[in-house]
Amino acid sequence: MELVLKDAQSALEVSETTFGRDFNEALVHQVVVAYAANARQGTRAQKTRAEVTGSGKKPWRQKGTGRARAGGVKGPIWRGGGVTFAAKTQDHSQKVNKKMYRGALKSILSELVRQDRLVVVESFSVEAPKTKELKAKLKAMNLEDVLIVTSEVDENLFLAARNLYKVDVRDVAGLDPVSLIAFNTVLVTADAVKQIEEMLA
């Protein structure tokens, strides 16, 4: 199959298995959920009454004071006491096979092509790290909510896009399923398309 280059009167020959496969919604959902889960730290930690520092001594005698009976000062109803159902450190990570991960990326890319949301250009760069310059370039192409994918890290482009709302710059190695579906349009250079094909082959 062919992808038309927006900035040149030519087309780029690409693999049907990468850019023309059927959309597998269940697979994409599973991979996106796993990706988000793997980004979680899971480092929250609270103490139960057994773990709180403090005395185990009975604060006052059982009878005769007129106060409610109490067996200790570390219970959940006491200030400084433990938490009833204390949150513990948790590993939220989910295993995703390489084949599934690549399959999800292919599915997303193919759907972007079908919906005309994947824009391929010969090259894309800015002369200086100026947001104004990048904004003007995107406006000329009628693009706002866009993910720019390049073959390698472009420092000028990254710095120019950093302060723009709903604009992000990634190299092929930094591509992930969440960023691909988070933007309305994905702008990819021809070199990046070839790298994506090699990566997902």
Curated annotation (Swiss-Prot):
CC annotations in GO: ribonucleoprotein complex; ribosome
Annotated Gene3D superfamilies: 3.40.1370.10
GO molecular function, one term: rRNA binding
Pfam families noted in UniProt: Ribosomal_L4
Claim: RNA-binding is one of the keywords in the record: yes
Residues covered by region (Disordered): 45-71
RNA-binding keyword on record: yes
Keywords on record: Ribonucleoprotein, Ribosomal protein, RNA-binding, rRNA-binding
Regions annotated as coiled coil: none
A biological-process GO annotation: translation
Subunit: Part of the 50S ribosomal subunit.
NCBIfam families with a match to the protein in the record: rplD_bact
Family: Belongs to the universal ribosomal protein uL4 family.
Function: One of the primary rRNA binding proteins, this protein initially binds near the 5'-end of the 23S rRNA. It is important during the early stages of 50S assembly. It makes multiple contacts with different domains of the 23S rRNA in the assembled 50S subunit and ribosome.
Protein name: Large ribosomal subunit protein uL4
Phylogenetic placement of the source organism: Bacteria, Pseudomonadati, Pseudomonadota, Gammaproteobacteria, Alteromonadales
Annotated gene: rplD
